[in-house]
Swiss-Prot record:
Residues 205-219 have a biased composition (Polar residues). One of its GO terms (molecular function) is myosin light chain binding. Interacts with MYL6. Its main location: secreted. This is Spermatogenesis-associated protein 6. One of its GO terms (biological process) is spermatogenesis. Residues 170-221 are annotated as: Disordered. There is a cross-link at residue 247 (Glycyl lysine isopeptide (Lys-Gly) (interchain with G-Cter in SUMO2)). Required for formation of the sperm connecting piece during spermiogenesis. Sperm connecting piece is essential for linking the developing flagellum to the head during late spermiogenesis. May be involved in myosin-based microfilament transport through interaction with myosin subunits. The modification Phosphoserine is found at residues 216, 218, 264, 273, 324, 342, 345, 353, 423, 464, 486.
């Protein structure tokens, strides 16, 4: 293979320190600096979280441009690359980026005269951008760069570049292990290592078109794929997963659903069949819905009918006989039916519920339940509760108590006497009951003022509360604005 000349760009980067005077970090974990140039990521050693951060790290980045003819082409291609610096603190779980700095690789490698501190010195200082965890001024990065563009032979240089790339992307070693690295390198130089030839072979193989190799699925994948339904397989057919046929290793028993025989027609009349019909229709819609094709559904299942269905029918017959014997009017029977509908759907299997053996509400509370007025009132209240969106637990009816009637009459008499006191100017204010309402700014609203102005206490009280809340809101807004101005 003939050797072709190419241009190689090398960057020697020396990172000195990161300074940020007067800034103290809240976290005490170590910090390191991550650098990305030519798409190659490298990082410095970790240092304590105390400014200034002294790194004194030296790194070399190299990249070959086989299509470049002159250095101008290399510089033009560097405009599309970005040099990135990230100051990262080892805060669990994945670390926290404190500040960053990014610049065009061309301007980073070949800075202008105003970006260099001295005429013969290549030291540079750039201001990084704060992200989080830093309070105060932005940190400043001090480093120096040396850039060289040279010619190389692409056939022999590829092996060397691959070797250097593997070495540079290795984890950063600690200083005490440098001696071991030097001895190992000297031994590798003395002996003819086959690694370089291996890199050359890999580079030649990389030029050839690559082909994907198929692997047999793992047992877990095989087991999971066997559990997919036929609908899911049809959905995955356009992915061309291959002609592999997934077969079950062991035949599993079918999915079992325990089912109870349907109740007798009399029980359906008691509980109401429309609810079950709606539930059955919803279940059929769920099975026939094409939006659930990706969900797992068993292909076959059995229905096991238990002998407890007979007990269920017997309990329903007992319940029906009990309700028919206890019912005294048609509205009461409808109320009982609604009560049964609100109970849980699961019924006892072996014996009827002990609730059926309890005494009725009439026997427990000793009230006249069978009167037509009470039954109509109960029926109307149940209708209102069912129509409302927010049904609260409340009493079905209120018993008429003579003591309550007396209290209402007493309150009416007091109100009438209060109005009579207001109309009588000779009646002393110390002898009559006070009905004044405290307003804002030391004002009071009395019954006499209400009778003169034709306004009751309620709207006056609401206006007073509106003024009070409006003043509180203004005070809160002014206090917030004062605090913001102080900050």
């Amino acid at each position: 293979m003939p050797k072709v000349k190419a241009l190689q760009c090398a960057l020697a980067l020396e990172i000195r320190s990161v300074t940020c005077p007067g800034v103290v970090l809240k976290d005490k974990e170590d910090i390191y600096l991550s650098i990305c140039v030519f798409g190659q990521y490298k990082k410095t050693q970790c240092v304590p979280a105390n400014f200034p951060l002294v790194f004194n790290a030296r790194m070399v980045f190299e990249k070959v441009f086989p299509e470049a003819v002159d250095p101008g082409d290399v510089v033009a291609q560097l405009e599309y690359d970005t040099a990135l610096f990230e100051l990262i603190q080892l805060v669990p779980p994945v670390g926290e980026t404190l500040s960053t700095y990014d610049e065009n690789t061309r301007d980073f490698m070949f800075p202008g005269p105003n970006q260099i501190s001295g005429h013969h010195d290549s030291n540079r200082q750039v201001t990084m951008r704060r992200i989080s965890g830093l309070r105060g001024i932005a940190p400043k990065l001090e480093f120096s760069t040396t850039s060289v563009i040279t010619e190389c032979l692409i056939s022999s240089r590829k092996c060397r570049t691959q070797d250097k790339f593997v070495y540079h992307t290795a984890p950063v070693e600690k200083p005490h292990s440098r001696l071991q690295n030097r001895t190992s390198r000297s031994q590798k130089k003395k002996s003819k290592s086959p690694e370089r030839n291996k890199y050359c072979i890999n580079a030649k193989n990389y030029e050839q078109p690559t082909t994907s190799k198929s692997h047999s699925p793992s047992p877990y994948t095989k087991r999971r794929m066997c559990e997919l339904s036929e609908d899911t397989r049809r959905r995955l057919a356009h992915l061309n997963l291959g002609p592999y046929e997934f077969k079950k290793e062991t035949d599993k028993p079918p999915f079992v659903i325990r089912h109870v025989d349907p109740p007798s027609p009399r029980a359906d009349a008691l509980f109401g069949s429309p609810g079950r019909d709606c539930e059955r229709d919803g279940w059929s819609r769920l099975h026939n819905d094409h939006s659930h094709l990706g969900c797992y559904r068993p292909k076959d299942y059995k229905v096991i009918r238990t002998p407890h269905g007979r007990d269920f029918d017997e309990s329903l017959e007992r319940c029906e006989d009990y309700l028919s014997s206890r019912s005294c009017s048609k509205p009461q029977h409808s109320a009982r039916t609604l009560l049964v509908h609100s109970a849980p759907s699961t019924m006892p299997k072996h014996s009827p519920s002990p609730v059926l053996n309890r005494a009725s509400l009439r026997e427990r509370f000793h009230s006249d339940w069978c009167s037509p007025s009470n039954c109509d009132e109960i029926h109307d209240r149940v209708k209102n509760v069912l129509k409302s969106h927010q049904a609260h637990q409340r009493h079905l009816y209120d018993e008429r108590d003579p003591e309550k009637e007396d209290e209402l009459e007493l309150k009416r008499g007091l109100l009438y006497r209060d109005s009579a006191y207001d109309s009588d100017p000779e009646y002393s204010s110390f002898q009559r009951p006070r009905g004044t309402l405290h307003l804002d700014d030391g004002e009071y609203w009395s019954n006499r003022a209400a009778s003169y102005k034709g306004k009751s206490h309620r709207p006056i009280f609401e206006n007073s509360m509106d003024k009070i809340y409006r003043n509180l809101y203004k005070k809160a807004c002014s206090s917030v604005s004062h605090t913001q101005e102080s900050f």
